[in-house]
């Protein structure tokens, strides 16, 4: 920019001024929410994290994060880095939760028929139920009595996973 000043006698002088406009404002991210995904395993959950929305008064040249390839069950904090064309950087954290809301599967053992030895105090041996879960089975229980009365007794087996989800099957 050239500045010129003229006095009342018509004398003038000029000076040149250089004005440089620089970007010192970092990009911004709005509404970065925690994300929740269903677990498929204890340690190897393949999760596709959606790209975040960022804006800048110039041009964004990179949006990156440090998310692992495979997520463990539980909470992971990832860091996003947004850089604009002027080198301004904004770093923000995002919480990723991998949860287990799926009930385990359980298969009760086969039915058992034994010869009675008394009317009320029959010992019965039976197999154990089989259960599986996407993450981890905590307990497998049943409501079988210690001794069985004469006749049919329904035994309910229950599998509970580490997140408290449960499923039952009868024998």
Regions found by a protein language model. Name each.
Residues 1-171:
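Proline-threonine-serine-rich low-complexity tracts
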């Amino acid at each position: 920019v050239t500045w010129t000043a003229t006095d009342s006698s018509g004398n003038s002088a000029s000076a040149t001024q250089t004005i440089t406009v620089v970007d010192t404002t970092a990009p911004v991210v709005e509404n970065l929410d925690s994300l929740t995904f269903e677990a498929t395993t204890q340690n190897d959950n393949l999760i596709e994290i959606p790209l975040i929305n960022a804006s800048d008064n110039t041009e964004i040249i990179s949006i990156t994060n440090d998310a692992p390839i495979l997520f463990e069950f539980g909470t992971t904090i990832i860091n996003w880095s947004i850089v604009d064309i002027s080198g301004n950087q904004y770093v923000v954290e995002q919480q990723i939760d991998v949860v287990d809301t799926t009930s385990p599967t359980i298969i009760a053992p086969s039915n058992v028929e034994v010869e009675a030895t008394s009317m009320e105090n029959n010992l019965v041996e039976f197999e154990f139920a089989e259960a599986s879960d996407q993450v981890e089975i905590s307990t497998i229980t049943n409501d079988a009595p210690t001794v069985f009365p004469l006749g049919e007794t329904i035994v309910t087996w229950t599998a509970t996973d580490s997140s408290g989800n449960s499923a039952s099957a009868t024998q």
